[in-house]
Amino acid sequence: MPVRAASWSFTEDDFGAITQSLQRFLHDSNARCALLVDRTGQLVATVGEQPTFDATAFATLTAADFSANDQLARLIGESDFTTLFHQGERESMYLADVARRVILVVLFDNRTTLGLVRLKVKQAVDDLTELFTRVFARPTGEGAPNVLAGSDDEIDKLFQ
């Protein structure tokens, strides 16, 4: 059964390939967790350590962060920023654009370095871009369940 998000959907095989790519990335980078979020703020996949926070709210805020930074890029004459980095005392996150429609979010701590994460993200983004390019090129099937139904109500509840 296809999973639907925005105007595209992917199959169980697609999801398996995406998950395998993320698992390989986590192993190679020693990062804690990788999340895929579409540009509308919908959580597509989570691999690695399960987040201890509300992943749905996090996905929404991640998409908003990436969108805001795209606008900042335009203000300084860039078309966009393809990666973002946020550093904390104990936890950091690295965000990367995948195929202009999905955001790879990497959560990591002092078990790895920013340099290693950046190095391994490049290959992961290339792999995921190839996978998602095929998914986006495929016609969406009729009758695929619309997982966005009711999402406006859920988003409103987050901020009440």
Specify the residue positions occupied by each region the protein language model found:
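Acidic, low-complexity cytosolic segments
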Residues: 2-33, 40-160
